[in-house]
């Protein structure tokens, strides 16, 4: 099948992101958000949120679990639905360390999420299981106790309602090894779950942990999965994991954001790992009508600030 490939660069808030257009011939609790029926509604999404290692250490040292969120909370709170990729379990007894690749954060980081107005946490990634199923279960308990929905765990969707529009969220991990309880990017399972949720919601969003770390271009595997997800019935894809910003593709009229970069993490060792974008996606009913990317830049090993441009 022949495809015409068009590359368009557009500037949102001074952030140049490539947008690729392809022309092709071819239950958790439901929480209502009160707004008027015909008004637009906004979905806000972040890059990787990892309240572990130095982020955890500094937060505890500063005795302020809202510290990492101070400069971005007003943006996140402004969304009707705000979704994050939480790439670290939250534990009652998390060891304090500045290094290593076994991630966890103190359970009190939940205060930061609440402060920033987080509604949905996607947990399907390669670090949420660093403390096993027990750590996952503890994290889910803490999140739900504060009214934050979760998805990407035990093949369970999250559903939120705004303007009488039902927005459904699924999440899958395509990195590392399969872990108990974490939703894996098995295409047969994904297709079934997307089609099942499709019948229950008006807007269907899939969050993906995928791709190669520290790369600015989506891999062939990412593109293959992305097109499969859209063809299976999803409306929108939110990607993360590479820790760099990656471009956007519009496929069959649907947006695929391959990676938002880092939002809260301690990777201070390169310019690219300090950068991220907060996506502000405005819908009218079921239709996406505006896309904005707000650039962020991490300072002090974990606190992002908002930039006018990179």
Describe each PLM feature range.
Residues 1-2:
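Short, Lys/Arg-rich N-terminal segment immediately upstream of the first membrane anchor
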Residues 5-310:
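Acidic, metal/ion-coordinating pockets
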């Amino acid at each position: 099948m022949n495809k015409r490939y068009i590359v368009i660069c557009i500037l949102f808030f001074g952030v140049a992101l490539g947008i690729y257009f392809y022309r092709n011939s071819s239950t958790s609790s439901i929480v209502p958000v009160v707004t008027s029926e015909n008004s637009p509604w906004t979905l806000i999404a972040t890059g990787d949120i990892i309240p572990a290692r130095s982020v955890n250490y500094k937060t505890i040292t500063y005795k302020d679990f809202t510290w990492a969120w101070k400069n971005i909370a007003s943006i996140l709170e402004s969304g009707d639905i705000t979704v994050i990729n939480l790439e670290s379990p939250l534990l009652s007894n998390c060891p304090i360390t500045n290094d290593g690749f076994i991630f966890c954060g103190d359970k009190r980081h939940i205060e930061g999420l609440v402060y920033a107005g987080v509604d949905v946490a996607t947990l399907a990634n390669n670090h949420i299981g660093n403390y096993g199923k027990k750590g996952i279960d503890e994290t889910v308990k803490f999140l739900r106790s504060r009214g934050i929905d979760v998805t990407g765990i035990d093949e369970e969707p999250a559903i939120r309602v705004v303007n009488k529009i039902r927005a459904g969220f699924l999440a899958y991990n395509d990195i590392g090894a399969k872990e108990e309880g974490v939703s894996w990017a098995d295409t047969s399972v994904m297709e079934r779950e997307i089609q099942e949720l499709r019948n229950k919601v008006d807007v269907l969003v899939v969050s993906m942990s995928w791709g190669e770390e520290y790369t600015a271009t989506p891999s062939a595997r990412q593109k293959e999965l992305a097109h499969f997800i859209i063809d299976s019935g999803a409306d929108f894809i939110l990607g993360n994991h590479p820790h760099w910003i990656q471009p956007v593709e519009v496929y069959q009229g649907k947006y695929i954001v391959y990676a938002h970069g880092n939002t809260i993490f301690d990777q201070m060792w390169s310019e690219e790992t300090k950068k991220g974008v907060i996506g502000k996606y405005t819908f009218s009913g079921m239709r996406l009508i505006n896309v904005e990317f707000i650039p962020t830049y991490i300072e002090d090993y974990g606190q992002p600030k908002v930039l006018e441009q990179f």
